[in-house]
Amino acid sequence: MFTDQQKIGAMLSAMGLFFGFLGVLLFLDRNLLALGNLLLVSGIVLILGLQKTTKFFAQKKKIKGTILFFFGIVVLLVTRWTFVGMVIEIFGFVNLFGDAFPIVISILRKLPIIGNILNHPLVNRLLQKADSGNELPF
């Protein structure tokens, strides 16, 4: 079903998210955030392949998110402004992968523990407001 390259890419992406989360928990540790970014991007390349990854990041409607995501990585690596780099990078990440959030939420709702939390009336109402797209969730 999945090739070995895609399995390695999924693991690298998961490790990238883990190291990024750990970098945020450790008060924006620059080295862990940089390692997380490197692993996440290389994992995406291995999952999709180089040609599809280039095609994904170069889409006309996603070019703003691509520029912000990679500019945030550059700010994080080159300067000492880790917080600014993370904010820029997260904004770019949301612009790039925001279309997939409803799919991820519907998958998470089917999981045993997380599904119960997401189906709670307060959380469910918040997610429905965020999904409508025309109003803020708060």
Swiss-Prot record:
Q: List the disulfide bonds.
A: none
Per the record, ranges on the Cytoplasmic side are: 1-7, 52-62, 109-138
User: What InterPro entries does this protein's entry cite?
Assistant: Got1, Vesicle_transpt_Got1/SFT2
The record places the following residue ranges in the Lumenal compartment, namely 29-30, 83-87
Protein's UniProt keywords contain Chloroplast = no
CC annotations in GO: cytosol; endoplasmic reticulum; Golgi membrane; membrane
Localization per Swiss-Prot or TrEMBL: Golgi apparatus membrane
Query: Looking at the record's lineage, which domain of life comes first?
Result: Eukaryota
Instruction: Return one Gene Ontology term, BP aspect.
Output: endoplasmic reticulum to Golgi vesicle-mediated transport
Q: A Pfam family in this protein?
A: Got1
Predominant location of this chain?
A: Golgi
Membrane topology, record value: Multi-pass membrane protein
Can the keyword Transmembrane be found in this entry's annotation? Answer: yes
Q: Any stretches that span the bilayer, and where are they? A: 8-28, 31-51, 63-82, 88-108
For this UniProt record, the keywords arranged alphabetically read as follows: Golgi apparatus, Membrane, Protein transport, Transmembrane, Transmembrane helix, Transport
Q: Provide the function of this protein.
A: May be involved in fusion of ER-derived transport vesicles with the Golgi complex.
* Family per similarity comment: Belongs to the GOT1 family.
Q: What is this protein called?
A: Protein transport protein got1 homolog
To which species is this protein native? Answer: Dictyostelium discoideum
The gene for this chain is golt1
